[in-house]
């Protein structure tokens, strides 16, 4: 997911996305531990998506404190 797409979402939607990504990462790690994960690169992409969501949330928080 692109950062521009994330910036168009509301803060509540971003928090929902963050929770979804975290649960997906948990599931992927569990699959990796049990040897069922075929696409290990997916973990990397989910981690990056989590970072993007957190970055957008931090930008909004910073903007609110400055405004």
Swiss-Prot record:
Pfam families on file: Ribosomal_L29
Keywords: Ribonucleoprotein, Ribosomal protein
Keyword RNA-binding in record: no
Single GO biological process annotation from the record: translation
GO terms under cellular component: cytosolic large ribosomal subunit
PROSITE patterns assigned to the protein according to its UniProt record, in alphabetical order: RIBOSOMAL_L29 (PS00579)
GO function terms (MF aspect): structural constituent of ribosome
Annotated NCBIfam families: L29 (TIGR00012)
Similarity comment: Belongs to the universal ribosomal protein uL29 family.
HAMAP family (UniProt xref): Ribosomal_uL29 (MF_00374)
Name assigned to this protein: Large ribosomal subunit protein uL29
Organism (species): Clostridioides difficile (strain 630)
